[in-house]
Amino acid sequence: MVAVMQTDMGETENSAVRPKVTDAKGILKQNRQFLDYFWDIAKPDRQIRLKAIEDLINYLKNSEQADELKYTLKRLVDGLSHTREDARSGYSVALAQLLSVFEEISLKSTLNSVKEKHNLLTASKKLIRNAVFGNFFGVLALSQSTRLHKEPQVMLECVQLLQSLSEYREHLRDLPRKTMVDILSETSQDVFEEVLFSALQSDLTSALKSPEQLELLLVALQKFPSVLKPKKLKKLLGTTAVITKQNMPRLVEVLKTAARSVKKENILPAVALDLLQVSLREDNFEMFWTDAIITGMMSEMPGPTHYLSFRLLGASLPLLSIPQLQFVLSGDVMRQYGEHTMSAQMPDRFKFAPEMAGYVGEFMQSCTDPDKQLVVVLGFTQLTNQGNPVVPSYWKALENMHPSAVQRYVDWLIEAFCKPQLENCLDFSTRRQKGNQEAAVESESCVSRFRKWIIPRLTFIVENQQIKKQEALVMKVVRFIFFHAFFEVKKPTSEIPETTQALSVPINQQTRTAVVSGFYSLLQALNSMMVLGESVEVQGLNFRRIVGVQADGSMWIYSVFQFASMLLNQNKYVKSLQSFSPEQRQGWDSVLESVEALRKKAKTASSPEHTAFQQLFLLIGIQMFTSPEESLDLLKDLQTCMEKAQAKKSKKKKATDEPHWVEVIVEILLSLVSQPSRLVRSVCKTVFGRICPHLTQAALSSILNVLDPNKDEDESGVVVTDDKKRKLKEEDEDDDDEEEDDDNDEGDDDDDDDDEEEGGEEGEESSDSSDDEEEDEAMEEGQEVDQNFRLELMKVLQGQNALATEEDGSDDEELDDAAMMKLDGSLASLFLEQRKKIQAKKDEKDRLNKEKGLVRDFKIKVLDMVEVFLSKQGFSPLVLGMVEPLLSVIENGMSSESSQPEQDYLRRVADIFRNRLCRGKFYCKEIDGREAELHEMLERLIGRAQKLTDSSVALYYFSAALYVLKVLRGSVVDQELSTMGKVEVERATTCLKNALTSFMTKRKSPLTGAMFIDLFHRFPVLCVNLMDTALENITAGLRDHQQGQACFIMLKALQCKHVKNLMTGEQTTELYKKVVDQLTKSLENVQCKNKTAHDKVVKALELCLHVVKIVLNQKMRVNLELLQDVLASMNAEGCLEKTGKLEDTYWSVMRLFGVIKPKMEKVKKVPEAEQTEETTKKKKGFLPETKKRKNRKKPTILEGKETETPVEKTPEGASGEGKKNKNKKKNKKRKQQAGEETQDQPTPKKAKMQQQQQQKQKKKKKKKGADGE
């Protein structure tokens, strides 16, 4: 082998052959493994480095050779100066581990080796950086070996070396100082006093010059306070303490330097926090905070110094006492933080608020003192921007508050709402606000902003499940918000605690609207809140996921309703903002009576419908405070509905009678769900889930009619009208919203008045800006609008005699000034009228779009009810009536071009249909008497699927058909696969056979092969009946695609184990004979002329592979000779000897017949003629062939003509290059000849380029001829 390799490499035949190297003892392999560890230690991947270090240490532990340990130490010391950072750190960690495990290695000798290998004095300028890193990482390894404190002299040398490395700051930055701090933190007091203090004295003396040196002093002070006593500190710094007036300017400069050094890292320098701790120990915190932070750091422009102050504020919270916290949280640092938070709202600006929230969250989590927690939360709450607190109402930092602190905080919020004391807040205005405001900010607006912030904060405390609270606290918040949303105090009374807290400033309408909104948001949270408490009963309720109730089982909304009833009966002390008429008040009392009656019945015999009626009564009753008229109508319907439901139960009518109360309650739910309220939507969804078992076909039809696309026009008008009426009533109640709308309308009217009366610059600009809109609208409406407007314009001009005619020969100069003014007025009014018409059309279009959006939103809410019904009552026979309506929605939506919201709605419908209905866990099993109806539905679904044009829609119809088949078959175990339940097998087979035939013979069929494969897997009995049809179409299919799909379907059918179990041995053998015959016919004279034919052959070969394998393994009596001959003829010309899916499948089949794919013989390149010295010798003045510019653009060959390619003589020495050029020319010539058939004439641009290329070639020929001479 070696001799052959030498011959191939061109060596002489007489050269000596090396003896074969043997490694019988495995020494080479062992050494290779050992050396690989060092390669892995230097790799960038951290996990690989750590694994290599661990393996190296284990290898050395088990090794018996001392030389390997020495080599490892030398190799690791050498690697400390590696050019890559990852490699340096890897070698350093490995060296630290080595020194830690093998204590026989001397630290002294190791340090000497590091100094000797990476000598800073003898290193060149180019290598000084590597030497610096080598020394530093060597010391770092020694410090991490956990042995350094045992050898003080080595520690001293390490510290001295680190001091010398501090000069190379451009390479190491502050790493030497940090390492010295780490060494100090692990040093005992005796070693520090006896050994290190003298060495570090120079650094400690200059501690106020840099952050690193100051950090060294602060760590020494913290670790060795008995050594660095005031007397020694006096010698070092000149003062007996660090925090003094004398040292303050230098401390400020050090802090500024530290702030700038971490500008990119966004972290708090350790020296700042250590300084703060020193100030606390020296009892000089207020002086440090005032002089160093507020006066020194905050005097700078906003930037790194401010951010350091903010971080120090957040980090200091766990360290401070309550007076110190109050001092810090009411100072200038907090004010500056507030200004930064408000001015950093722009997207590209740095935002510190998330970082501060993290500091506060960590403090709240670690602090166990409720008083401190309350002080911090109040400090951030009282940081206000013109009355509006800076922190958001929804603040996750409150999640770890102590329950007692939460109680006191809620009391403070309630008191602040009633009697705001903004003078106690740390209020500020940003620079932009100061510049924009002409006068002082009104106190009432500040109070309004503060109150509108308090309500969401109270709501958040109740909503957040992580905040620990009691039911009494929740009820207190609910009562407070409800009272101030809908009532006013006439006279305080102790019976109503809410009346005892008088309002120092009356609540304006804008604030009242916010309180109402907050109440409904709170009610929504209560409706979905888990039971509060830690008792066993509470845990049982939470385990059953019962929400919206208190520990005693009563609903939260019922407690609110009781409180409201009590307030309505206390007319002497409180006044309702919503005055009720006698009829409305009677309706309220009837609600209370109905609810009490339902509660009594629920105690004796609880049922879901009782709870559903209670929720509806209470919800509609509460809504009487916002929309009494609509609520009263709903209450009457609901009352009648409940009476009929009870009457039906008492009379015990037959089950065939339709319970009308369900239909009424569904209509009420549909009416309620049209309102844009999360609370109403949630309650309606819950109530509908409870009445699902009683739902009837008529009630379900009323829900499906909403989704019916054919009834959009009728239903949308009702929904939009109801919604608009409700909105108008809300706007009548909300004066503030009215004012804003009026302002906008007045602004619009003013613009119109300016256009009509002044006709000045603004009118001209607006008319100019609307010209494009007029033209666009005119183009959309067609030419008729333009003609009408043109006629009107002609009439105006003719009426003023301003239109020149051929008869009178008049012109514009005949009009006097008065006529011209009159003409201008007429034209202005005409154009204004035209613009109003265009605007009216645009408004109408916007109105229609808005109506469509409202209808779509309403349908999405109704889909919630459909989803709830399918989830809870998937086994109900009513589900069968939902199949075709949902399919109608899907088909209509996919057949029309729709916007993104419409597509989202359609996607929701399709998801519910596919996952909740067709693939639902439960399905209808009670179909007695409905078999004929279901078979007709099956035929309709399959027939409709064949008539569609979109395969995606057909897939939903086909899935629905499979669902109907599943319902008809019922539940079947694997042992009873031959039974099909109540399916009429012949009828179903005929229907599906027609569909399969249509798929195989129709040119553009919406059906796909995947549909039938799914059918075959789920219903093996039908698969057996349809296999003959699929088998016939292997050759009878309309196109290659259908024939390939037939092969694929047959392959999946034969692979199905359930199909095998349904067939006898003789049937299976006969089937395989037919398959072989069909495959033989299909593969005769096959040609892969396009991709479709190619795919068909691939699928046919895959079927062949399965069939041949089964026939041979089971030794069936099936003749495979004809198939083998056909397969052999496919490769008669050797065209299937390449690689590819088709070729690989083909040879897999042939391998079963014992035919192995022939190996491709590599054709060796013909040896080129030997170059003579004359031809290889370069002539002077000639460029080599590799340097010559190639002309890549070849002229285009005209049709019917041939161009002679110029033959360039190349020197023999460049024969390889010449051969490559020849191959390229051949390829280009083939492409040109292929293009002759389709190319008629060259474009002018190509012709011009051809002339230029021909001229260049002529010049080259001339130049070569001259050179040759």
Curated annotation (Swiss-Prot):
Bias type Basic residues, positions: 1177-1195, 1221-1232, 1256-1269
Annotated signal peptide: none
Keywords on record: Activator, Biological rhythms, Nucleus, Phosphoprotein, Repressor, Transcription, Transcription regulation
Entry keyword ATP-binding: no
Gene Ontology terms describing biological process: rhythmic process
Biased composition (Acidic residues): 731-783
Biased composition (Basic and acidic residues): 721-730, 1199-1211
Localization in the cell: Nucleus, Nucleolus
Region (Disordered): 708-783, 1163-1269
Gene Ontology cellular-component terms listed: nucleolus
Protein origin, superkingdom: Eukaryota
Residues annotated with Phosphoserine modification: S810
Family statement drawn from the similarity comment of this UniProt entry: Belongs to the MYBBP1A family.
Biological role: May activate or repress transcription via interactions with sequence specific DNA-binding proteins. May play a role in the repression of the circadian clock gene expression.
Name of the protein in its database record: Myb-binding protein 1A-like protein
